[in-house]
Amino acid sequence: MGTGDFICISMTGGAPWGFRLQGGKEEQQPLQVAKIRSQSKASGSGLREGDEVVSINGNPCADLTYPEVIKLMEGITDSLHLLVKRPSSGTSETLDSESETTNHQHLTHEGPMESTTLQIQQATETQSEDFFLAPVQTKVPLTEDQSNAWGYAECPKEEQAPPMLGSQEGHLVEEVILRQKAEAGQPGHVVELQLSLSKERHQCTSGPIVTLQGNDKSTSPDPDWSSQLERTVHINSIPAPEKADTSLTSSTSSGRELRVIQGRDPGGAGLPQVEVILDCSDRLKAEECRLQTGRGCVASPVEGGRSEAPPSLVSFAVSSEGTEHGEDQRSGKDQSRPHKHRARHARLRRSESLSEKQVKEAKSKCKSIALLLTDAPNPNSKGVLMFKKRRRRARKYTLVSYGTGELEREEEEEEDQEAGDKDEISEVAFLGTSESEVDEELLSDVDDNTQVVNFDWDSGLVDIEKRLNRGDKMEMLPDTTGKGALMFAKRRERMEQFTAQNEEEKTGGMAGGGPDALQTDGLRTMTSYQRKEESVRMQSSVSESSFQMGRSLASVPQQNGFSGVSETAGAQRMFPMNRTAKPFLGSMNQPAAPFSPTRSVTSPISDFPAPPPYSAVSPPPEAFSRGVSSPVAGPAQPPPWPQPAPWSQPAFYDSSEQIASRDERIAVPAKRTGILQEAKRRGTTKPMFTFKETKVSPNPELLSLLQNAEGKRGTGGDSGPEEDYLSLGAEACNFMQSSAKQKTPPPVAPKPAVKSPSSSQPVAPVSPVWSPGVAPAQRPAFSTSNPPNPPQVTAVSSIKIAQPAAPPARPASALNLAGPFKGPQAVVVSHNYTPKPSAPTPLVNAAPAGAGGPSNELPGMSGKGAQLFAKRQSRMEKYVVDSDTVQAHTVRAQSPTPSLPASWKYSSNVRAPPPVAYNPIHSPSYPLAAIKSQPPGAQASKTSKKKGKKPLNTLDVMKHQPYQLNASLFTFQPPDSKDGLPQKSTVKVSSAPAMKQALPPRQANVGSPTNAQASSVYSVPAYTSQPNFFAAEATSPVSASPVPVSVPTSPKQESTSTSYFVAPRPKFSAKKSGVTVQVWKPSVVEE
């Protein structure tokens, strides 16, 4: 063999090893490494391309063919030890001595003295060129990476290693590098013993040169270690026959003794022995208590074989360059992680993947952090206190919850909690962190029956308790946990008992009984639904609206009474009516609040009769007021719970069924209707308008409900769905309404032509003016006086549009007429008006307008939500404008549109795009008049079509006044309203022609003047101009603005503007709401 370096390379972890071989006996070429894959075990272990493989796991490769080598490699499953020869011309081993010394850590000793003896054995005369290198006895600390346990391994004397081929040319210099390292919690040193012997040492021509090196770069606190000096001792090696016991001892400045002994081996050959005695500092001695004993294996560098020796402490290599180092060996305990003697290199370790390395680093980091938190230098530091506080809070909220979840889940949670809460877990000592490897091993070893002491350093020793293996945890749970476990067990039993019963219930069978079980359950929310889809769809009415107290005996009999088959049938009959998705229909009049039991039902009296009104979209005024109090419910049992009980499913189902259903619901959430969850989900997406809930519902029934009590009655007796709408919100309401049977299907489109009070006037189509104006209080007052007329109330409720409520006689025709006009206006209102004339416009602000009942019933409908809605110009056509909002709009005259539908654009110069055959120049004078009196505005609009062109000069007045002087929203006012406008002689002059013009289109409203007068609400006096004050009255109801304004004032303004007002088209009706916003509405009919 040529000159080269013999290197032992060890890899663990099993195939693939990451290298390819070539050559073999059949090719008459040495077995060499052909290729090495990057980031593989081979590359990490230092194997290089071109290395000649001498032996594999102790099997010489010189006589092996390539297939035999492959077969041999395939048979290796755990660790691979290669003895390779690297040409001396090649570069030195990847690890350079200096870099290793800087990365190794301080040596910790079990005792004050550590003796390491290396034996260099000389071969027989026939193999004079071969040398044997074997450690005779070692007693050094066992160390691995920081994540491994500490310990010492004392190994017996190693058997003689197989011969190692040596070079026959020149001098073969053998270097034995003894590396000793241990982790003592701080950086340490690397001790290198370099023994250089010439090849002719057996001839006594030269002696061994021993170099003992210390790491002067160490940061160890021990000054001796950091101040060590490198010393080289030249020893004259004497053959064994001459001096068998000759020894030379040299001591270094650090107190270490280096002794080279010339001894005799059993075979009689002289064996030079180098003995290094290291003296430990007191500090190191004190740390020996922290070390644990363990055993490991080390591979002989010469052959690659394994023998009992301290792992990763001693590495041997034969190198002519003096730079070769042996490979560390992993401890037998940790077979999964290979370790090189370089402890914490950034490079990949042998047979270690990148992920493993990252995990190891993370663990060490966590360990150091935990140690800092456990034994903090300053326990009062902010970080430590915060850590403790958070852990306490986490512990507080990770306790087992009672009444939810399943037993297995509870067990898991308990285990996690206990594992997470105990920060010190160790078999013998209290370690400072739950992330420690000892803790990890204990927790991961399921079969380990050893007892573990848990120490929570937050709570102190009081919390220490002994746990057996995981299987026994449930039995050992604390009392508090035991209670929850009992509840779960009971529930499970109940589930089993009612499994068959549930099946029957699904088929529609009602099982009676189980009241006692219901009572035992105590406070339970009746969220269970009948197994049938109908029951699921059915209002969770009784059950969900309130917790049912099964305890009350009174409620139980009622339930039993309801359980009757006939009652079941009645309940089923109710189902379609109650189909509307109601979060809590338990009580007829229950408020939207899920748990307000106070207003059980308008009357629990006839349970089944009550549900029909409930189903009706519009509840009676009483029902509507239910939110405020439980009017009829009062007669029911005083406790809210008992009252819902009769209505609760118990009426239709057995208490046992309820219990089972509740358990089932816990286990099978799919059974839930999901209405509440959906509503909640929708609610989270905050609509642009933040009304309470039912602000905007296209359902006509809902509109009627909002308008007034009469409207509600007219719509239907059922208030339940309406209440639900309110509680759930606009979107939920729409959903619920669609599911619920409604007497009149709600128009899908937001802008459908729906009957509205304003529609009462047939002229509406002629001038569809958008008036989102809030009229002065005077109008509200009128509207208040007019409440008797449902249409008026409706007008008020609707956006406070200045639409006059048509007289009761007219409503039907008005509605029809309004249809065309109403379409756009409906957009403004954003509520679909119920075809019923009574309550066409349900608006949040309507309540203040004078529908006192609605306003009280729907307090949430008005207020910031409505204002916000108007400001944001919600595309949904439901919005409310308050007088305050209108006032605010006056400031910014340019954009009154916020309250108007998006389709209409407002221009400061031109009120609205000119309608067909309409000249905006002529109309300007009219808007002023319209602003002053809206009912007259309708008449004026008609007249204005012809006469509005006269007062061109008024255009200027109009431009400035409407916006700056008078804040007004143009509300649609049929031409009829104009007729009533004539206020003063001047007004009358203009109004007369206006009336003439308006009359033809408005003949339908001919009867309205009387009505208008009677109602003083937006009634349209078609023929003669009525007193200004009267006209103002008419306008006021339309505007329905909450702010009262003196009637006389409006007449004056109206009179001033009426002169122009009459001339311009009646298309525009302006309110005196004071809002600058004015919209010109093109009149559908032009003359």
Swiss-Prot record:
Residues modified as Phosphoserine: 300, 319-320, 540-541, 543, 546, 555, 596, 603, 618, 697, 719, 767, 771, 895, 899, 903, 1008, 1050
Comp. bias regions, Basic residues: 338-348
Biased composition (Low complexity): 751-777, 1037-1051
Stretch list, region Interaction with FLNC: 803-1087
Any single Gene Ontology cellular-component annotation: Z disc
Region annotation (Disordered) ranges: 24-52, 88-112, 207-272, 320-359, 581-817, 832-863, 930-952, 970-1012, 1037-1060
Phosphotyrosine PTM positions: Y614
GO molecular function: 14-3-3 protein binding; actin binding; muscle alpha-actinin binding
Expression sites by tissue: Expressed in skeletal muscle, heart, colon, stomach, uterus and lung. Expression is restricted to muscle cell layers in colon, uterus and stomach.
UniProt-annotated stretches for the region Interaction with YWHAB: 551-557, 599-804
Post-translational changes noted in the entry: Phosphorylated by PKA, and by CaMK2 at multiple sites. Dephosphorylated by calcineurin at Ser-555 and Thr-602; abrogating interaction with YWHAB and impairing nuclear import.
Impact reported for S555A: Impairs interaction with YWHAB
Domain PDZ, chain residue ranges per copy: 6-88
Locus of motif PPPY motif: 611-614
Compositional bias annotation for Polar residues: 207-230, 246-255, 781-797
Protein name as it appears in the record: Synaptopodin-2
Organism: Mus musculus (Mouse)
